[in-house]
Amino acid sequence: MKQELIERFTRYVKIDTQSNEESHTVPTTPGQIEFGKLLVEELKEIGLTEVMMDDNGYVMATLPANTDKDVPVIGFLAHLDTATDFTGKNVKPQIHENFDGNAITLNEELNVVLTPEQFPELPSYKGHTIITTDGTTLLGADDKAGLTEIMVAMNHLIHNPQIKHGKIRVAFTPDEEIGRGPAHFDVEAFGASFAYTMDGGPLGGLEYESFNAAGAKLTFNGTNTHPGTAKNKMRNATKLAMEFNGHLPVEEAPEYTEGYEGFYHLLSLNGDVEQSKAYYIVRDFDRENFEARKNNVKNIVKNMQEKYGEDAVVLEMNDQYYNMLEKIEPVREIVDIAYEAMKSLDIEPNIHPIRGGTDGSQLSYMGLPTPNIFTGGENYHGKFEYVSVDNMEKAVQVIVEIARRFEEQA
């Protein structure tokens, strides 16, 4: 199993599937289509049925039941795309067997070093096989680790028919990283009673609370004139952007928050005197606090418009997803079974809120309750990203055990 995980994962991460916030196609990038087509063929090779990829790039497949019991249909999902925060082109995965727990020089030329000082969890992986980047790209374990684990788990179940299970549905979705994953997901066609996303982080992660999330695009319009004669004429759009940011609470940013604390996060800022554009994300677990944060953004914009003119600041703000807890609580048994599955495998469940979102955040509100399970990855979205193959193997075991327990309890 370990070799299959390594082979699939290292092959998958070399395919550039970064999504693109600026694109209006579905999926937003051709790499996701290319990857989806490959997975369709490999799902067929494994032996799954009803394998298809629709016009929007969603891949679905079925592992038929091998029991006569009336078992609810369960689903397992992962996403095709990788994050846009750092380049995902020309990924060169590096395999470190029997890791010694010490610092790893990812790239000597660029002096990129993965150190225990910066990443204190690193020594806990001593003895594991870990896969890192070469220091020039992200790895793409988010979510190609989860995707690989689903593929390997389905292969394992097919080759071990003594493990009884009900009908299992598999889906791989595009554009999760930009919040569009479930936008065209056909819940009815998927046909599962509930599902699990394999899109978590370190060993034991079991998550069914997510942020409420919104994205805010701000355009600041200035007036450019020669600086020598600019008095009472120039309006500097870049300074307007700085002023807006200055009205947000400094301590309510990602770098100062944890646990259940929400934040405002400036993702990008670019422009000049004439025009500047900023993109923020707004996050909070509590719905009332979430609405208050959005209203704060609107009020800052309104005050700046009154001060500089209505055209000085233009705001586009949209909700992206909501806290899935509200939809998971009525079917809490799906969390309990995942919890029990982990315990039976000597994995200590780590239940905590997702300081982010998964496809499950939206799918839960579309009628498909979907908690999230660990994949074994660390430090997502950057050059220090890595994954433990040992913990990927444990994630596969959790998938198999969840399927087995649902059949056993039917």
From Swiss-Prot:
Cofactor binding notes: Binds 2 Zn(2+) ions per subunit.
Residues annotated to bind Zn(2+) 2: 142, 177, 381
Cleavable signal peptide: none
Record GO biological process: peptide catabolic process; proteolysis
Binding site for Zn(2+) 1: 79, 142, 199
Catalyzed reaction equations: Release of the N-terminal residue from a tripeptide
Alphabetized Gene3D superfamilies for the sequence: 3.30.70.360, Zn peptidases (3.40.630.10)
EC number: 3.4.11.4
Active site: 81, 176
Annotated keywords: Aminopeptidase, Cytoplasm, Hydrolase, Metal-binding, Metalloprotease, Protease, Zinc
Annotated localization: Cytoplasm
HAMAP family: Aminopeptidase_M20
Function: Cleaves the N-terminal amino acid of tripeptides.
Protein family (similarity comment): Belongs to the peptidase M20B family.
NCBIfam families with a match to the protein in the record: peptidase-T, PRK05469.1, PRK13381.1
Protein name, entry field: Peptidase T
Source organism: Bacillus cereus (strain G9842)
Gene that this polypeptide is encoded by: pepT
